[in-house]
Amino acid sequence: MPSVFVQGRPTASYPPFAPEAGRGAVRRVTEVGEEVLHRPCRDVTEFGPDLAALIDDMFRTMYVAEGAGLAANQVGVDLRLFVYDCPDDEGVRHVGHLVNPVLDALDPAARRLLDEGEGCLSVPGAVMAVPRPDRAVVRGLDKDGVPLLVEGTGYFARCLAHETDHVNGHVYLDRLSGRERKAALRQSADRREEVFARRAANAAAFAA
């Protein structure tokens, strides 16, 4: 089994950070409550240098914020797009981006739900148990408009489902009870200062 998949394809070797991050700039991460996170994003219809530059910025922002995935509306851009650099439960690394992603519906009889911890860069510092299927299949396009299919299991399946939720206008708090949502927001308030200090240090390290 290859140790790295890039854009859903096995790759012999890959650097610690996606090359896109070296070209990108850090953008502000939007937070829960901001309108752009709570409405469905627009389809990407223009493929070109502006889209490529956005992907570069998203990779750099994701690494600085210590995320496994990042959707465009998490940097304030109302487009159906996300990037990811995420391991699965077997330790295989998955890196890439998806434009106009659509999550396949799984046969309920064949799927297994995993009720495990999940966080979000737009709810800084909070982690709550969220049930998600242990497998995900997402179809979309790459930055050049070429069709892509990406499959994930375990933690990577959770990442794919989480990021597809984002472009559909949902955050993981929407999957929690009212009491759990309040607990997550309290966690975020308590840990916010620590999270933002780490992000600032990471941004400085990337710029060095």
From Swiss-Prot:
Gene3D superfamilies hit by this protein: Peptide deformylase
SUPFAM superfamilies, A to Z: Peptide deformylase
Example GO BP: co-translational protein modification
The enzyme's E.C. designation: 3.5.1.88
Record CDD domains: Pep_deformylase
Cofactor: Fe(2+)
Residues noted as binding Fe cation in the record, renumbered to the chain: 120, 162, 166
Note on cofactor: Binds 1 Fe(2+) ion.
Catalytic activity annotation: N-terminal N-formyl-L-methionyl-[peptide] + H2O = N-terminal L-methionyl-[peptide] + formate
One Pfam match: Pep_deformylase
Keyword annotations of the record: Hydrolase, Iron, Metal-binding, Protein biosynthesis
Keyword flag Protease: no
HAMAP family reported in the protein's UniProt record: Pep_deformylase
Family: Belongs to the polypeptide deformylase family.
Name this polypeptide is given: Peptide deformylase 3
